[in-house]
Swiss-Prot record:
Keywords: ATP synthesis, CF(0), Chloroplast, Hydrogen ion transport, Ion transport, Membrane, Plastid, Thylakoid, Transmembrane, Transmembrane helix, Transport. InterPro entries: ATP_synth_b/b'su_bac/chlpt. This is ATP synthase subunit b, chloroplastic. It is a single-pass membrane protein. Coiled coil: none annotated. Signal peptide: none annotated. It is found in: Plastid, Chloroplast thylakoid membrane. Pfam families: ATP-synt_B. The keyword RNA-binding does not apply. The chain crosses the membrane at residues 15-35.
Length: 170
């Protein structure tokens, strides 16, 4: 199969050129009319994106501020907790010392009371013993006088010693 000269492949070159021209005109019209709208849409989209970026920056800035405030509040809370802990330890130590002091004072008072009680009972026993010894001594003296002396001498001596013992205060 051979092709005749001058006819080519059988394509109509004229139609191809017309199609290219028509395509160029359509593209030009589309660019002319749609280009403004497309530019407007792109500008609106760009403006929306920029606004979103500004809002995101603003929200990020607010978030940073809130984070910093929260961080400061956390530091203040930690300081307050440390202060409360140290005050609690100080108060516990003070209370412990007060309890120990009170215990020592109570112990000293009990010891003093014990000593006073011992002294009281010692004095009571000495007093009873003294009275018992004096009465026994008087009985022995009376017995000796009753055996050896007459009644008149006995009465004189007894009155003398009774007077002396009644004047004596231990």
């Amino acid at each position: 199969m051979s092709l005749p000269t001058g006819e080519g492949f059988g394509l109509n070159d004229n139609i191809l050129e017309t199609n290219v021209i028509n395509l160029a005109v359509v593209v030009g019209v589309v660019v002319f009319f749609v280009g403004k709208n497309l530019t407007s849409i792109l500008e609106n989209r760009q403006e929306t994106i920029l606004n979103n970026l500004r809002e995101a920056d603003q929200r990020a800035s607010e978030a940073r501020e809130k984070f910093n405030k929260a961080k400061e509040q956390l530091e203040l809370a930690e300081q307050k907790a440390k202060q409360i802990r140290s005050e609690g330890l100080l108060k516990a130590t003070t209370e412990k010392n007060n309890c120990l002091t009170q215990y020592e004072q109570d112990l000293a008072r009990l010891d003093e009371y014990k000593q006073e009680t011992l002294q009281f009972y010692q004095q009571k026993v000495f007093s009873q013993l003294y009275v018992s010894l004096v009465s026994k001594a008087l009985q022995k003296v009376k017995q000796k006088f009753d055996k050896r002396l007459d009644n008149q001498f006995h009465i004189t001596v007894n009155n003398f010693f009774i007077a002396r013992f009644t004047e004596y205060n231990p």
